[in-house]
From Swiss-Prot:
Protein topology in the membrane: Multi-pass membrane protein
Family of the protein in this entry: Belongs to the PIGG/PIGN/PIGO family. PIGG subfamily.
Signal peptide coordinates: none
Any one GO BP annotation for this protein: GPI anchor biosynthetic process
Protein name: GPI ethanolamine phosphate transferase 2
């Protein structure tokens, strides 16, 4: 097996991961904060009039992913909110939410007033037991309000409980898990059921409610989901209840989204939809401001309605309205619109308090900046409100840009390790292919050339955003090089691959800067009959491949037969046929039920099958009831996972007993393809038809030139490794993924689960988003080791490379070495780019997400799937 070579390779891979991790540790440090808790700089509050605060109580209602148009546009169904605005009882805003637009960093922002670090986006997925993000010892408006002997009650997203230990902050509380996106109703009902008791209970001063259902609907069906109207009406009804029950009290109602969502319902990036949630202050007291605003407004694509503010401006505004010191690390500015509640002389005092708090932070970091200090003194002497706001805006910009400090020691150590690994990988690769192997050097330079060109693209933000263009170019170049440089026969297969690549390229929206409605997936969503015909065809083909392409049927027949025709007459073959098609039908049934449960129209000709599936489990479909098949979907997924597990175990065990060495790679690949179908969205499923066509055509091209390629296996390794790299990346982007966190698909992350499990849900999330790369990783093993089996040519299967017991590990080693070179060069270039452009405008919105995606590529795809899993599968053959 060449254990020493493998030991060295795994050691290098581990060092590569260590170097990359150390770099990330230095590049994504925790945000620098000033310790301690703030006090009024004069010892007395400037926010009170006649010794009274403007408000005594607060109700903060956070509606997760409440984009501004959901509140204010003429597409909105929140009629009571519109009524409040028209009656001058509410102040509406669109609030800019700093990326990354995920819940944890946004909650930090709206409670401390600080800007989030990108590290918070990673920690957002931590499980409920993680308390590393606690804000117990950091100043926040919760701490300040509580310090005034105020009592908090909290119900909703348990992310709040990670930030604020409930035993320290909340009198009553109940958390709901924010990651179980299949739940649209219970997750909100568990919040609302507390309202009847709490609204009439005078033992609270602040009530925090965080609703998750709207966000979950977005993840599952997008902003135009059939469930969106009902959820908006539900939220509007809750706002009406909260407002009317507290209208006679001195209570401030704040309704807001922590972030928005993009046009596919996800978030995490920096698009207009994601960064522009709504923010509403409601109270009869606002009538005195006489804003005379109208609502709803016409829908607009930039999602900017009414006045545009920073979301963190909420923090000093709450401090002003509720009379407590502005939190020490706040970077928000008191919202100008609310100053009309005070007399002109008091307005200046409020802004001076905000300025004092800003300067405390600024002087702690820039003690010797006399220009800013002089400008500050001038603003204090000015009687103009605008001068104060200009100064605050300037300091806010300076503090925001310097909120995070890089740990340069970690960055340099990580970079040094990555440089060393790239040099070693380059040396090992060239030593093997230029010294030991007999390969034509041009193939070696083809691979290195593509690796270099790919690595260079990381130094331009637009190329990272549109990376699919690079892989489309590489795929075509690779195909032509494969065909013409090897003088391969069968032109028809060349054209089949070329057409297949073009279809794959156009399957989904693949970039961040340019989008188009003219994609295959968009067309299929508009033509559901064709969509489900193709889905049936995909599942049918998968069942046929599982049944007949490999050697599964030979493992279960009662005796050995010479031909497939004789095999199918065997009783064991019949059992295999039934099990295979039943397993595929379970996954198809799940897809159909999931599609219906998400509120989408099922074709009329499939309704009978849907009803039969539901009735088999004692469910009668009620058109008025939403999300009624949730439990059935969990059950179907569990059954499928068990069936797939049984198929794999039976194939391995019976194969060992009957000493069937050929076809195992193909059998495992086909069964796992069924799992990948299960983890893909319905409009993505048919792309696997094209994948299978391209794989079969590539196998035929290689088979027709078998004599030449078998004479030089190293040449075969380079060709297939390069081809699989191109197909892995092209398929990743063509299935709707990008280098933005906003396109991470969670719709299939909870298949088979009733609750959130960070590890298992993480596995399913990876498989859902990297289904294409996983498919082509398995396909590359088939093309190398079982090419004739892929071509259904069992008579030649004895010539496949999988039968070379000792050489097969050397072959996989060479493939893994090539992958290591590619990822080490690319990883080094990426981190060098991020370090060089660390002050670039798009460092957090473009380059930093790519760092996280590349970590998934190198650790999970290259090391875990391409190397470790491939080695494990090969050991079974």
């Amino acid at each position: 097996m060449g254990s020493s070579k493998w030991g060295v390779l795994f050691g290098l891979l581990i060092l590569h991961v260590i170097g990359y991790s150390i770099f990330l540790k230095g590049f994504f440090p925790s945000k620098v904060v000033v310790p301690g808790f703030n006090e009024f700089h004069t010892g007395q509050s400037p926010f009170m009039e006649h010794n009274e605060a403007k408000f005594d109580k607060l109700i903060l209602m956070v509606v997760d992913a409440m984009r501004s148009d959901f509140l204010y546009s003429d597409h909105s169904h929140m009629k009571f909110v519109h009524q409040l605005i028209n009656e001058n009882c509410a102040l509406p805003f669109t609030s800019y939410s700093n990326p990354p637009t995920v819940t944890l960093p946004r909650l930090k922002g709206i409670t401390t007033g600080g800007t989030p670090s990108f590290l918070d986006a990673i920690l957002n997925i931590a499980d409920d037991k993680d308390n590393s993000q606690s804000l117990l010892n950091q100043d926040s408006w919760l701490h300040q309000f509580q310090n005034n002997s105020k009592v908090f009650n909290f119900f909703g997203d348990d992310t709040w409980l990670k930030l604020f230990p409930p035993e320290k902050f909340f009198n009553q509380y109940e958390g709901t898990n924010s990651f179980f996106v299949n739940d649209f109703t219970d997750v909100d009902n568990n919040v609302t059921r507390h309202l009847n008791d709490d609204l009439f209970n005078s033992k609270w001063d602040a009530l925090i409610l965080h609703y998750l259902g709207l966000d979950h609907i977005g993840h599952k069906g997008g902003p135009n989901s059939i469930f969106m109207r009902g959820k908006q009406e539900e939220m509007d009804g809750i706002i009406e209840k909260l407002y009317k029950e507290t209208i006679d009290s001195n209570t401030l109602l704040v309704v807001m989204g922590d972030h928005g969502m993009n046009e596919i319902g996800n978030h995490g990036g920096s698009s207009m939809g994601e960064t522009n949630p709504g923010l509403l202050f409601a109270s009869p007291k606002f009538k005195m401001l006489k804003k005379n605003l109208k609502s709803p407004l016409a829908y607009n694509n930039d999602y900017k309605y009414y006045n545009y503010i920073n979301q963190i401006d909420l923090v000093p505004t709450l401090a002003t309205l509720l009379n407590f010191p502005i939190p020490k690390n706040n970077l928000g500015i008191v919202i100008k619109d609310i100053l009309g509640l005070w007399k002109p002389e008091a307005q200046k005092s409020i802004l001076m308090e905000n300025s004092e708090q800003f300067m405390n932070i600024y002087e702690a970091k820039h003690a010797n900046d006399t220009d800013i200090i002089n400008e500050w003194k001038k603003s204090q002497d000015s009687g103009s409100i605008d001068v104060h706001y200009d100064f605050l805006s300037k300091i806010q910009g300076l503090l925001t840009s310097a909120a995070t400090e890089y740990k340069y020691v970690d960055i340099y150590i990580g970079l040094s390790i990555l440089v060393a690994m790239a040099i070693v990988a380059f040396g090992l690769f060239n030593w093997y292919f230029l010294v030991q192997a007999t390969i034509n050097p041009k193939y070696n330079w083809y691979f290195i050339g593509i690796s270099i060109v790919y690595s260079i693209h990381f130094h331009a933000s637009s190329l990272i955003e549109e990376e699919y263009q690079i892989w489309w170019f590489f795929s075509i170049i690779c195909l032509f090089a494969l065909y013409f440089n090897n003088h391969l026969k069968s032109l028809k297969y060349f054209w089949l691959i070329l057409v297949g690549l073009r279809i794959i390229r156009s399957w989904s929206i693949t970039g961040q800067k340019f989008t188009t409605p003219y994609t295959f997936s968009a067309y299929l969503l508009q033509n559901v009959d064709l969509l489900w015909v193709l889905n049936i065809a995909t599942y049918f083909l998968t069942a046929i491949l599982i049944y007949s392409q490999g050697s599964l049927i030979h493992c279960v027949t009662l005796r050995e037969y010479e031909s497939l025709r004789e095999n199918v007459k065997d009783f064991g073959s019949l059992v295999t046929f039934i099990v295979t098609f039943v397993t595929c039908s379970i996954s198809f049934s799940f897809k159909l039920c999931q599609y219906f449960n998400d509120g989408k129209r099922v074709p009329d000709w499939l309704l009978a099958f849907l009803n039969w599936t539901c009735e088999s489990y004692g469910i009668t479909i009620d058109p008025k009831e939403k999300n009624q098949l949730h439990e059935l979907n969990i059950h179907l997924s569990k059954i499928l996972f068990y069936c797939i597990g049984v198929l794999i175990i039976v194939r391995i065990v019976l194969g060992k007993i009957r000493k069937l060495h050929y076809g195992l790679l193909t059998d495992l690949s086909n069964v796992l393809t069924l799992f990948l179908l299960h983890q893909s969205r319905p409009e993505i499923v048919p792309i696997f038809l094209i994948f299978s066509l391209v794989k079969f055509s590539a196998a035929k091209l290689l088979a027709n030139n078998e004599i030449v390629l078998r004479k030089n296996i190293d040449q075969l390794m380079i060709i297939i490794t390069l081809f699989s790299l191109c197909m892995q990346n092209l398929s990743f982007f063509s299935m709707g993924n990008t280098n933005s966190l906003a396109t991470v698909d969670l719709s299939n992350s909870y298949n088979g689960f009733k609750s959130y499990d960070v590890f298992l849900v993480g596995v399913l999330t990876y498989c859902s988003n990297f289904a294409g790369p996983i498919f082509w990783s398995l396909a590359s093993l088939q093309l190398i080791f079982e090419n004739n089996v892929v071509c259904f040519d069992t008579k030649k299967s004895s010539k496949d490379l999988v039968n070379l017991k000792f050489l097969k590990y050397q072959i996989l080693y060479v493939k893994s070495l090539a992958g290591f070179l590619f990822y080490s060069m690319a990883g080094l270039s990426l981190v060098a780019s991020c370090f060089n452009l660390r002050f670039h405008l798009f460092i957090w919105s473009v380059f930093s997400p790519k760092l996280l995606f590349f970590a998934s590529w190198t650790l999970l795809t290259n090391i875990l799937i391409d190397t470790i899993s491939s080695l494990s599968i090969l050991a079974l053959c």
